[in-house]
Amino acid sequence: MSTNSSIQPVSPESELLSNTTCQLEEDLSISFSIIFMTVGILSNSLAIAILMKAYQRFRQKYKSSFLLLASALVITDFFGHLINGTIAVFVYASDKDWIYFDKSNILCSIFGICMVFSGLCPLFLGSLMAIERCIGVTKPIFHSTKITTKHVKMMLSGVCFFAVFVALLPILGHRDYKIQASRTWCFYKTDEIKDWEDRFYLLLFAFLGLLALGISFVCNAITGISLLKVKFRSQQHRQGRSHHFEMVIQLLGIMCVSCICWSPFLVTMASIGMNIQDFKDSCERTLFTLRMATWNQILDPWVYILLRKAVLRNLYVCTRRCCGVHVISLHVWELSSIKDSLKVAAISDLPVTEKVTQQTST
């Protein structure tokens, strides 16, 4: 009787724990989390500073929409990394004793919501950036006249609100986020799934993530093919494509990083949701795919840091010098963004502005 009475007060909280466990190297996990969070915060902070400076420079120009979305993506990565990393370090510092420091499951719910949001929102933003560039390259006049910064901000808000809604679905459905087998993170229920609703959350998360990656791939492929066709057909607008190529290269970098980092975790969640694999047999593998997914938040900002026009230009010069080729004048990279976009978009507003300037000068 005394044994039963001592267990009963703990049982409500223990129901939130996974019934399986993962063997982890404690010291390695703690140091990994601290170093990982520090590097991620510094990387995203540097990328935010670069993108904000570029956005202020091109605020009324052709790159403003792209830079706005890119800044939102990096800011999302920054706060997701900061919040999730802080909670993870706290959990390790508390010896992963969830029953002691989170009896009401509030911290686990916050952790789970942040995990889902910081996972889906960057993928959505990456696909939205790919769509924006695809329209900008294939339909430049429509993009220049119809898609304004106000519209981009509305789409950005819609994407963020949708990601928040998906993250809040279990709470709205009176379900709890579960402490996973490693006791270091919270997510949807992944072991001993018997309810269709628990499967639905996993499959919805995996489907939305894979759909975002698929949209990014298709749009980036269309954009790249369109630019290559213009390049081989005519050299008339070669000067107007430098910024297009810069943004497309960055998008391709984001897409590759997202696919490599997120695909294993999304496929694993889909497999668990469809009961193809048992979570008990893949606990360590699931934790490994989760760490791969979180690497996306570190690598994303370096795409913008390293794949900028200035860096690519210097890399181009160094490569040609190393190959013993005479360095030609890179006038493609030297035109302003507004002139480039006007040439590509074929908007003939220049005569009107010239008339106005002539009238004012006289």
Curated annotation (Swiss-Prot):
One GO biological-process annotation of the entry reads: positive regulation of cytosolic calcium ion concentration
Its transmembrane ranges are 32-54, 70-90, 110-131, 153-175, 199-224, 251-267, 286-307
Q: Which residues are glycosylated?
A: N4, N19
Q: Which residues lie on this side of the membrane: Cytoplasmic?
A: 55-69, 132-152, 225-250, 308-362
Q: List the disulfide bonds.
A: C108-C186
Q: Which SUPFAM superfamilies match?
A: Family A G protein-coupled receptor-like
- Location of this chain's protein in the cell: Cell membrane
Q: Which residues lie on this side of the membrane: Extracellular?
A: 1-31, 91-109, 176-198, 268-285
Q: Which family does it belong to?
A: Belongs to the G-protein coupled receptor 1 family.
The protein's name is Prostaglandin F2-alpha receptor
Q: Where does this protein come from, organism-wise?
A: Bos taurus (Bovine)
Output the lineage of the source organism.
Eukaryota, Metazoa, Chordata, Craniata, Vertebrata
